[in-house]
Amino acid sequence: MQVTFLGTSSGVPTRARNVSAVALRLPQRSEMWLFDCGEGTQHQFLRSDLRLSQLRRVFVTHMHGDHVFGLPGLLASLGLSGSCQDGVDLYGPDPLESFLKGALNTSSTRIGYPLQVHRSRPAAEQGTLLFEDDELTVRCTPLTHRVPAYAYRVDQKPLAGRFDIDKARSLGIPPGPVYAQLKRGESVTLEDGRVIDGTTLCGPERPGVSVMICTDTVFCDAAVELARGVDLLIHESTFAHAEAEMAFQKQHSTSTMAAQTAAEAGVGQLAITHLSPRYVPGNPVSPDDLLKEAQAIFPNTVLAKDFLSLDVKPCCNSS
């Protein structure tokens, strides 16, 4: 997995930061998922090396404009490109479907590919999986914000152990399609009648990696619980610690709240994003100051910037 930040500002864009959007690359399946889609996100795609044609799923955290105003245009452009035959699944708060229908219908926009909207609320309230396939699961939880908001956690299922090709050769197993079967742990009958158990040629299972997107919210226990042991936590950090009172009023997080969540949850790495546009160069407090505040509590913290890409790596706490 690899994440690419397409927008890291809160509320409004700045010259250096667009509003919220995070792309999750899944190279093993030539697929990409998007978390939030603020205004201008499709322009950010054009400035990156991401391929919009690989977009398969979109997860919306909440319905504030800086997280959704780019979605109708992006979906329309995807339709015009004719490169989305498999369709797109969207997940988000209850009003997401009516928002999209209103924008697309009133603009006479035709989406020429399958588009399905799923509500996140039932899975968040019941603690069930929002999505699952052979390789990945997605869970979500309600956050504490002025409107219904959800954090999303993506977990990769355990990976098969590494295939011992030298051992296979020593047993006289000829290379070819049979190797793929053995790598999957299947039993294979060779031409000479021998039956080879693939599990004897594979090492132990390897843990998959995990990433969680947590925005918008003030510090809350639900976020800590969902984040436990996650490899990469992407957490909003709208305000500096000195403005904690404002953060509580607006139900946003400070840099120290994000770090506290990471520390209590035992995550591998923290990336802070969704910074207030007030923290621009020349102001008394800069984004680097927010980074230092977070690192004082959780040292393995990075400051997200537009077009920053991070490989999701397993941490020792990964569950």
Curated annotation (Swiss-Prot):
Q: How is the cofactor bound?
A: Binds 2 Zn(2+) ions.
Cofactor(s) the protein needs: Zn(2+)
Catalytic residues at: 66 (proton acceptor)
Catalyzed reactions:
Endonucleolytic cleavage of RNA, removing extra 3' nucleotides from tRNA precursor, generating 3' termini of tRNAs. A 3'-hydroxy group is left at the tRNA terminus and a 5'-phosphoryl group is left at the trailer molecule
> Disulphide bridges in this chain?
none
**Top enzyme class of this protein?**
hydrolase
The UniProt keywords, alphabetically, are: Endonuclease, Hydrolase, Metal-binding, Nuclease, tRNA processing, Zinc
Give the binding site residues for Zn(2+) 1. Answer: 62, 64, 145, 216
What are the protein's GO molecular function terms?
Answer: 3'-tRNA processing endoribonuclease activity; zinc ion binding
Where Zn(2+) 2 is bound, by residue? Answer: 66-67, 216, 274
Q: Which InterPro entries match?
A: Metallo-B-lactamas (IPR001279), RibonucZ/Hydroxyglut_hydro (IPR036866), RNase_Z/BN (IPR013471)
For this protein, the Enzyme Commission number is 3.1.26.11
**Gene3D superfamilies named in the record:** Ribonuclease Z/Hydroxyacylglutathione hydrolase-like (3.60.15.10)
Primary role: Zinc phosphodiesterase, which displays some tRNA 3'-processing endonuclease activity. Probably involved in tRNA maturation, by removing a 3'-trailer from precursor tRNA.
Report the sequence similarity comment from the record: Belongs to the RNase Z family.
| Assembly information from the UniProt record | Homodimer.
Name it. Answer: Ribonuclease Z
The organism named in the record is Parasynechococcus marenigrum (strain WH8102)
Q: What gene name does this entry carry?
A: rnz
